[in-house]
Amino acid sequence: SLVGSEMCIRDSWGGCAAAAMGFSVQVAHRIGAGDFVEAKKILRQAVTATLVFSSLLAVGGICISGMLPLWLGGDEAIWNDSSLYFRIFALFLPALQLNFLAGGMLRCSGNMRVPAMLNIMMCLLDVVFNFFLIFPTRHVEWFGVVFTAPGAGLGVKGAILGTVLAELVTTGGMMWYLCRRSPMLKFVGERGSFLPKRETLRKSFRISLPMGFEHMAICGAQIATTVVVAPLGIVAIAANSFAIIAESLCYMPGYGISEAATTLVGQSLGANRIRLLRRFANITVWSGMLIMGVMGALIYVAAPQIIGVMTPVEEIRTLGIEILRIEAFAEPMFAASIVAYGVFV
């Protein structure tokens, strides 16, 4: 049930990412054409439109959170924790939406460093907040030194609260940099309307809707897979989840190259440099396939060590290694789909 809730979270996550991308691509086109004034206008409209969208998504998520574990066929013993986890996540969807929007806008303006640094910070903060919120006050031993670590002892609630607090801090930093420091997109102190225009929304829908349906299809398939795997028992579910998490070592570089491809191709299209656009498309797709192919080979070889770090249970290890090695063969073609997706957006 917790795994199913995670899949629904990814679906919501994908919807927010798609909504942000619908405006980010338009900004990339305007920047490529040298029209920074229009780029800022689109950004202002994007803030309002995406906040409305994510708020509606949040309300829907909160409304279904109570029944979600039942629909996913989860064990009754963890229904309450699963519902609570998803409900808190849904409540903070507007913050996640602004994070996606600000990060996408900065990347499409050519700034990859700031979003990357802030998202790395978010991961670190997530670990720190979880350390203090999940567990109660306890004695901890690090490198032979024993000390008392304070803790809230909130369990599952602490896990999701740590995540959303990390999101809030990162979103604040991302929006501050975008609105006040970005050379191309800062608009604080400038006059402008935040009311979305019909033409901007129309273009956004044309870009976002296919992406949104794609995310729904992928996450729907993952949820269906979870429902199928669930009757096989906890070992099968855990092995499948650990293998998917380990596989992210491969496809995270692919998503990074995909973001770069969207920026390079979008700005080239805005500048009407079609030959350069095609060169960037070819370079990024082949680079993604090469890198993820190498990463796939590495995780195939290191699968026992990778899964071994994640769980001490021998049954889960054995099954997880098999799953991870099967997934490794798909990485080059998976890379092609990920990066080509960024190109065609």
Predicted regions and their residues:
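Transmembrane alpha-helix boundary and packing residues in multipass membrane permease domains
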Residues: V25, G66-M67, G104, F131, ...
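Hydrophobic alpha-helical membrane segments of integral membrane proteins
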Residues: V114-L118, L161
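Helix-terminus/linker motif at the lipid-water interface of multi-pass membrane proteins
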Residues: S1, S5, P69-E76, F132-P136, ...
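Short alpha-helical transmembrane segments in multi-pass integral membrane proteins
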Residues: V27-P94, P136, E141-S208, V265-A330
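Glycine/proline-centered helix-kink
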Residues: F100, V127-F131, A159, T163, ...
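Transmembrane helical elements of multi-pass membrane transporters/channels
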Residues: I88, N99, M122, A166-T170, ...
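Residue-level hotspots within pore-lining transmembrane alpha-helices
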Residues: S12-C16, L56, G60, A90, ...
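Small-residue-rich hydrophobic transmembrane alpha-helices
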Residues: S5-E6, R10-V59, N99-P115, T226, ...
